[in-house]
Amino acid sequence: MNGLMNGKRGLIMGVANSHSIAWGIAKSLAAQGAELAFTYQGEALGKRVKPLAAEVNSDFLLPCDVEDIGSVDAVVDAIKERWGKLDFVVHAIGFSDKNELKGLYADTTRDNFSRTMVISCFSFTEIAKRAAELMSEGGTMLTLTYGGSMRVMPNYNVMGVAKAALEASVRYLAADYGSRGIRVNAISAGPIRTLAGAGISDARAMLSWQQKNSPLRRTVTIEDVGSSALYLLSDLSRGVTGEIHYVDSGYNITSMPTLEALRVADAD
């Protein structure tokens, strides 16, 4: 099926490089005809994003710092001026002090807790509120979460709390905007080698563990996530909102490692 996103215009937030999950999503959308705008934070990231945007025939790049609400407003104003409307938004933004992702969650500082929540969670609500004003004919919103929102994951700490709040936000925003034909969903992806993932200690070991213990016995790719995002952002999912869609090779359904892994652990 081709042309699923023909005539659709959307904003992609969170591309850092060619390994970003947001980039995998952007490629899938562009391949189906979507016209894309990209945000970036700072000149260094802007230099990385510009050639990627060009690969999908986009010259619409906008600086954005989600900690500065004026910056968010400027992005929405620029989209309104150029396009007049918006069909979808992809929010792939998260941050926490990596030094506080190690050790005890209880040692999280007040400052890092607040900043993590604003960037990783509340920014989606602020963007959704403004984007909705450009979706007079309906639209879709998508954010990214992780299994650490539901279960304790090593070296994730306050990010797990932020992702749990983000998932709750998805449900409340879906309820807020459903009557206006605006759908809101999230993808919970398994661990992927990304710039953000590099901030998590022992990320390589976590990737290996999922590969060995998920039902599909493999990790996921940005292309896997991109395909699911295409479904959630297109009319194929027109009856779906408020959902957390797992793309993790089925790891979320497991409660124990494989028997092989248990035997190895027992032998140790």
UniProtKB/Swiss-Prot annotation:
Gene transcribed to yield this protein: fabI2
One of the protein's GO biological processes: fatty acid biosynthetic process
Record-annotated site: Involved in acyl-ACP binding: R204
Broad class of enzyme this protein falls into: oxidoreductase
Family in the record: Belongs to the short-chain dehydrogenases/reductases (SDR) family. FabI subfamily.
Residues binding NAD(+), per UniProt: G14, S20, I21, Q41, D65, V66, I93, K163, I192, R193, T194, L195, A196
Gene source species: Rhizobium meliloti (strain 1021)
Signal peptide: none
Keywords assigned by UniProt, alphabetized: Cell inner membrane, Cell membrane, Fatty acid biosynthesis, Fatty acid metabolism, Lipid biosynthesis, Lipid metabolism, Membrane, NAD, Oxidoreductase
Protein name: Enoyl-[acyl-carrier-protein] reductase [NADH] 2
Keyword Transmembrane: no
